[in-house]
Structures are given as structure tokens and as C-alpha cells.
From Swiss-Prot:
Protein name, UniProt field: Glutathione S-transferase D1
EC number(s) per entry: 2.5.1.18, 4.5.1.1
Family statement: Belongs to the GST superfamily. Delta family.
InterPro entries reported for this sequence: Glutathione-S-Trfase_C-like (IPR010987), Glutathione-S-Trfase_C_sf (IPR036282), Glutathione_S-Trfase (IPR040079), Glutathione_S-Trfase_N (IPR004045), GST_C (IPR004046), Thioredoxin-like_sf (IPR036249)
Organism: Drosophila melanogaster (Fruit fly)
Entry annotated with the keyword Magnesium: no
Gene: GstD1
Matches recorded under SUPFAM superfamilies: GST C-terminal domain-like, Thioredoxin-like
Gene Ontology MF terms: DDT-dehydrochlorinase activity; glutathione peroxidase activity; glutathione transferase activity
Keywords of the record: Detoxification, Lyase, Transferase
Gene Ontology terms describing biological process: glutathione metabolic process
Domain of life: Eukaryota
Keyword Transferase: yes
Length: 209
């Protein structure tokens, strides 16, 4: 039994859901109400002392950080290694894209939008410039490429599509970046679990209305 503690609106949680779908793992989903402090209860702290989501528990083995969970699911349950190839160079590029998503692209979203959504802070133009810079980088990575890392779908695409779709519901103009826009339209068609990802995006969209 693979237990999955999550929120549907969370981009990192959605990347795990899509990865699980891609490798055929059924998740026993457990909604965690952060506003009610469920992540701070002793029983959850025992599982994840960092009290973050997503958190996966696979037959007693607990893991958090979405990109680590993605890789674990592919390595343990993938019927092939196509989503995370064993070739060191291919894997290195995928890792770079995952770290880019975590430290640059998704981080730029969090830095700009979260203060507005959760603290009612005014928009910070400097933080918005970081978003634009992140999209310029991604646009460059995708020049002449259908996928984010290599010539087929990988966990890098899945992580990035979870993030980029969240930018879409925040009304960021993805279409200004031609390569990103082309990649994104293709990713919607080829990423397993896209429909559930989009449903989660629409949950998150309520914060912007």
C-alpha cells in the first residue's frame, strides 16, 4: 500500500500524482488540511519531521520532497527506465532540469505569488522579473526540443508541467515564450494524469479569484 499525503492544489503534489500514473502505481490519497494544522499532529511529524507535503509512505518507507518521490517511484515501479534513464549523461540533464524547477522556476512562483495570495501583500515587480528570467531560461532549454531533457517524456517534463500549469491559472502569459508554449501544449497531450493535474490547478485557481 502506497499512502500519499497531499493537497490537490499543490504543484509538487500533482507532479507525484502524474508520475505515479505514468508508472502504474495506485496511490492511497490522504488529504492533509494544512490550515487546520493536520501536518503538525504528532502522528504526521513521526512520518515526516519536516511536516511538508507531498509525503509518500510505501510499506513503512517514508519519503518527502516531490522530485525525490518522482525518482523513487520510477526506479522502484517503472517497467522501463524511460522516465529516468540509467545513462549518466541523460540522467544528469534530467537532474539539472529538476533542480531548475525546484530552485528557479517553482521558487519564482512561490516568491511572487504566495505573499499576494496568503499574506495579501502587494505585487513585487522585482520578484516578477525573476519569473520572466526563469521562463527565458526554460525557453532556451526547449529550443528545438519537444521535451525538457532528451527526446522523450521524463520526470523533468512532469515536474515542469505541474509548475507551468500553475502559472497558467495564475494568469501568467506563457504564450510570450514560444518554445515553452509549444512544449506545454504537447505536454498536456502526452503526460499521464494531465486531467487530474488540471483539476488540481483549478482548485488552486480559486486563490486568484
Amino acid at each position: 500500500m502506497v499512502d500519499f499525503y497531499y493537497l490537490p492544489g499543490s504543484s509538487p503534489c500533482r507532479s507525484v500524482i502524474m508520475t505515479a500514473k505514468a508508472v502504474g502505481v495506485e496511490l492511497n490519497k490522504k488529504l492533509l488540511n494544512l490550515q487546520a494544522g493536520e501536518h503538525l499532529k504528532p502522528e504526521f511529524l513521526k512520518i515526516n519531521p519536516q511536516h511538508t507535503i507531498p509525503t509518500l509512505v510505501d510499506n513503512g518507507f517514508a519519503l518527502w520532497e516531490s522530485r525525490a518521490i518522482q525518482v523513487y517511484l520510477v526506479e522502484k515501479y517503472g517497467k522501463t527506465d524511460s522516465l529516468y534513464p540509467k545513462c549518466p549523461k541523460k540522467r544528469a540533464v534530467i537532474n539539472q532540469r529538476l533542480y531548475f524547477d525546484m530552485g528557479t522556476l517553482y521558487q519564482s512562483f512561490a516568491n511572487y505569488y504566495y505573499p499576494q495570495v496568503f499574506a495579501k501583500a502587494p505585487a513585487d515587480p522585482e520578484a516578477f522579473k525573476k519569473i520572466e528570467a526563469a521562463f527565458e531560461f526554460l525557453n532556451t532549454f526547449l529550443e528545438g526540443q519537444d521535451y525538457a531533457a532528451g527526446d522523450s517524456l521524463t520526470v523533468a517534463d512532469i515536474a515542469l508541467v505541474a509548475t507551468v500549469s500553475t502559472f497558467e491559472v495564475a494568469k501568467f502569459e506563457i504564450s510570450k515564450y514560444a518554445n515553452v508554449n509549444r512544449w506545454y501544449e504537447n505536454a498536456k497531450k502526452v503526460t499521464p494524469g494531465w486531467e487530474e493535474n488540471w483539476a488540481g490547478c483549478l482548485e488552486f485557481k480559486k486563490y486568484f479569484e
